[in-house]
């Protein structure tokens, strides 16, 4: 897992997606504990566990979370993950895209969720209009933050984000886009519609999918039928 710059602010939309009253939460990439602080202010009895790869950020978060482990979550042994079982919610606030194999980690987590447990995630939209413009101009240059964060290892659109969870054994039960005021996009949307039309895709859907900067989703394990 690659590290993005530390931050002291939390995503309010992500916080709203996490139900109140959960007994145990595990946040992957808790940074300095901003989201944990906000949740614990309303839910002080929650066993909020932070996993953070950056030692300095983990040290700060340890003063907020109930416990913090400085680790690369993908390198954790199964018995280490089992120590968090059962967990009501695993939170990925812009961290799934930093993983080498998010599919495998999501599959492993399924074994350690409590009945009714869930994944809550915020995922950058790689179909965003600005991403398409840069790609069209040949300017796919990594940056220190944002959609082209140099620590991003995986890129997801709305469609492939859904496929990510489904292939790992989940179904998305709730989700919505994060849309910001970006007036510059209007001059590019007609071209995005036209490109989709030529490609045989739905122009209206292509335009709609080009507007969100991120998606907030809640996913639960698919229950397998027993014989």
Task: Report each predicted region and the residues it spans.
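Conserved SAM-binding loop
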Residues: 12-131, 157-162, 211-221
């Amino acid at each position: 897992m690659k590290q993005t710059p530390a931050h002291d602010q939390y995503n309010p939309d992500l916080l709203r997606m996490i139900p109140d009253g959960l007994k145990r939460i595990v946040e992957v990439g808790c940074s300095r504990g901003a989201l944990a602080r906000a949740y614990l202010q309303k839910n002080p009895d929650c066993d909020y566990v932070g996993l953070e790869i950056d030692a300095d950020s983990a040290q700060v978060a340890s003063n907020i979370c109930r416990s913090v482990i400085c680790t690369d979550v993908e390198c954790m042994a199964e018995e280490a993950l089992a120590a968090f079982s059962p967990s009501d919610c695993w939170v990925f606030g812009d961290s799934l895209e930093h993983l080498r194999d998010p599919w495998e980690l999501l599959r492993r987590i399924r074994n350690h969720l409590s009945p009714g447990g869930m994944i809550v995630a915020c995922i950058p939209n790689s179909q965003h209009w600005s991403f398409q413009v840069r790609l069209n101009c040949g300017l796919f240059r990594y940056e220190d933050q944002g959609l082209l964060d140099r620590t991003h290892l995986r890129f997801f659109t709305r469609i492939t984000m859904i496929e990510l969870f489904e292939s790992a054994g989940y179904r998305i039960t709730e989700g919505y886009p994060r849309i910001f005021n970006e007036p510059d996009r209007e001059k590019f949307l007609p071209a995005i519609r036209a490109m989709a039309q030529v490609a045989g895709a739905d122009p209206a859907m292509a335009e709609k999918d080009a507007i969100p900067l991120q998606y907030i989703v809640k996913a639960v394990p698919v229950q397998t039928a027993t014989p």
